């Protein structure tokens, strides 16, 4: 039986289909005649050193989903590993010769299209690597699919699992930039299944949008209690995608073999690593991952907003409230905005304007040109300046004009770290009855806190 499940939906699933039958027959359907076999992909760098994968017995591994074993490529007769039903502990060829089960019409016509296939192919040509950590690490590329052929009114559950490609452990040879077999595989990790958090849902909901498993995390912690997928480092794995029809019949366990359909994409196989081995994989991940901007070659002014942990909430406020006319459109702005919103959700930061005290503080820290939430009055009533404009000393400005807008988002240095010598933006007992002073050596601070519009009779100290 499954030792750990990454979603509370197991209880519901057990009412609709027998998990044991699902896990056992999932493997059988893959290795049956006409099914999927884990043979080397075209251009797979591993195939240079491993011309074929030897068939192995499922009993060698303790995976509740069995062990997906490939078919020999040396011209031998077709054979596949028999999947042992939990509790039986025996293997044989009967299940391999078993006639394929006729699928329920609710799942028979379902087809799945892998999103970002070109990117997956590019990684696969190099030999995809996925980082595993103790705390858990998300996959990149993210496993995303588009589903067709579902019954719009039927309920479905979507889940993923990972099976070893073979029973070998690998090492990376840096002198030849290739993977080599280092020996037999380590003891198998506990088999786990990741349920999509929206499961179960109607077919219409699944089909109207791309299904993304962006919450799935990989770990090498055998004692993990967060429901992450546990993998062995330096081993190869094949992700599998399963669609399970939620059968409302009371005796649905009798139809467990009919009510699911499994999809395997060869280009998504990968090697689990604790650190990237192939430098070309590292470069490709940096170039294609929208959240790896901090590792790219960029202007030095860009790095604080990507690496300073306290700058994200402030930058989000500027990004949401900035004047769209103040900066010209740039290529990829929509994609960057989507990635930033994704990162905001993932970072789980606290709301910026949760209480009045925070709003008061933000109204004094932010530029006077930015709208202040909660109906607060900006400190300056003078002519507002664009939120992205950084006023420089006239003596330091060169004659060469700036032909491009430097940054899409303001840097934390411009708006937070630039005015290092300004007075405190919050009230202090010693500050009474006078506005903020212009700083003769820091025009940016003078522009941020202008005393021209400060009310003369207002006391900034405690009342």
Curated annotation (Swiss-Prot):
<dbReference type="GO" id="GO:0000785">
    <property type="term" value="C:chromatin"/>
</dbReference>
<dbReference type="InterPro" id="IPR008967">
    <property type="entry name" value="p53-like_TF_DNA-bd_sf"/>
</dbReference>
<dbReference type="GO" id="GO:0045944">
    <property type="term" value="P:positive regulation of transcription by RNA polymerase II"/>
</dbReference>
<feature type="region of interest" description="Disordered">
    <location>
        <begin position="320"/>
        <end position="343"/>
    </location>
</feature>
<dbReference type="GO" id="GO:0003700">
    <property type="term" value="F:DNA-binding transcription factor activity"/>
</dbReference>
<dbReference type="GO" id="GO:0060788">
    <property type="term" value="P:ectodermal placode formation"/>
</dbReference>
<comment type="subunit">
    <text>Binds DNA as a dimer. Interacts with dscr6/ripply3.</text>
</comment>
<comment type="function">
    <text>Probable transcriptional regulator involved in developmental processes. Binds to the palindromic T site 5'-TTCACACCTAGGTGTGAA-3' DNA sequence. Induces pre-placodal ectoderm (PPE) gene expression in regions where RIPPLY3 is absent. Plays a role in the formation of the anteroposterior (AP) axis during embryonic development; required to establish the posterolateral border of the pre-placodal ectoderm (PPE) acting downstream of the retinoic acid receptor (RAR) signaling.</text>
</comment>
<keyword id="KW-0804">Transcription</keyword>
<feature type="region of interest" description="Disordered">
    <location>
        <begin position="39"/>
        <end position="58"/>
    </location>
</feature>
<dbReference type="InterPro" id="IPR018186">
    <property type="entry name" value="TF_T-box_CS"/>
</dbReference>
<dbReference type="GO" id="GO:0000978">
    <property type="term" value="F:RNA polymerase II cis-regulatory region sequence-specific DNA binding"/>
</dbReference>
<dbReference type="Pfam" id="PF00907">
    <property type="entry name" value="T-box"/>
</dbReference>
<comment type="function">
    <text>Probable transcriptional regulator involved in developmental processes. Binds to the palindromic T site 5'-TTCACACCTAGGTGTGAA-3' DNA sequence. Is required for normal development of the pharyngeal arch arteries.</text>
</comment>
<feature type="short sequence motif" description="Nuclear localization signal">
    <location>
        <begin position="420"/>
        <end position="431"/>
    </location>
</feature>
<dbReference type="InterPro" id="IPR001699">
    <property type="entry name" value="TF_T-box"/>
</dbReference>
<keyword id="KW-0539">Nucleus</keyword>
<dbReference type="GO" id="GO:0001708">
    <property type="term" value="P:cell fate specification"/>
</dbReference>
<dbReference type="GO" id="GO:0071300">
    <property type="term" value="P:cellular response to retinoic acid"/>
</dbReference>
<dbReference type="GO" id="GO:0006357">
    <property type="term" value="P:regulation of transcription by RNA polymerase II"/>
</dbReference>
<dbReference type="GO" id="GO:0050793">
    <property type="term" value="P:regulation of developmental process"/>
</dbReference>
<dbReference type="GO" id="GO:0000981">
    <property type="term" value="F:DNA-binding transcription factor activity, RNA polymerase II-specific"/>
</dbReference>
<feature type="DNA-binding region" description="T-box">
    <location>
        <begin position="119"/>
        <end position="297"/>
    </location>
</feature>
<keyword id="KW-0217">Developmental protein</keyword>
<keyword id="KW-0805">Transcription regulation</keyword>
<feature type="region of interest" description="Disordered">
    <location>
        <begin position="367"/>
        <end position="406"/>
    </location>
</feature>
<keyword id="KW-0238">DNA-binding</keyword>
<feature type="compositionally biased region" description="Low complexity">
    <location>
        <begin position="75"/>
        <end position="96"/>
    </location>
</feature>
<dbReference type="GO" id="GO:0005634">
    <property type="term" value="C:nucleus"/>
</dbReference>
<feature type="region of interest" description="Disordered">
    <location>
        <begin position="75"/>
        <end position="102"/>
    </location>
</feature>
<protein>
    <recommendedName>
        <fullName>T-box transcription factor TBX1-B</fullName>
    </recommendedName>
</protein>
<dbReference type="InterPro" id="IPR036960">
    <property type="entry name" value="T-box_sf"/>
</dbReference>
<feature type="compositionally biased region" description="Polar residues">
    <location>
        <begin position="323"/>
        <end position="332"/>
    </location>
</feature>
<dbReference type="InterPro" id="IPR046360">
    <property type="entry name" value="T-box_DNA-bd"/>
</dbReference>
<feature type="compositionally biased region" description="Low complexity">
    <location>
        <begin position="367"/>
        <end position="380"/>
    </location>
</feature>
<keyword id="KW-0010">Activator</keyword>
<feature type="compositionally biased region" description="Basic and acidic residues">
    <location>
        <begin position="333"/>
        <end position="343"/>
    </location>
</feature>
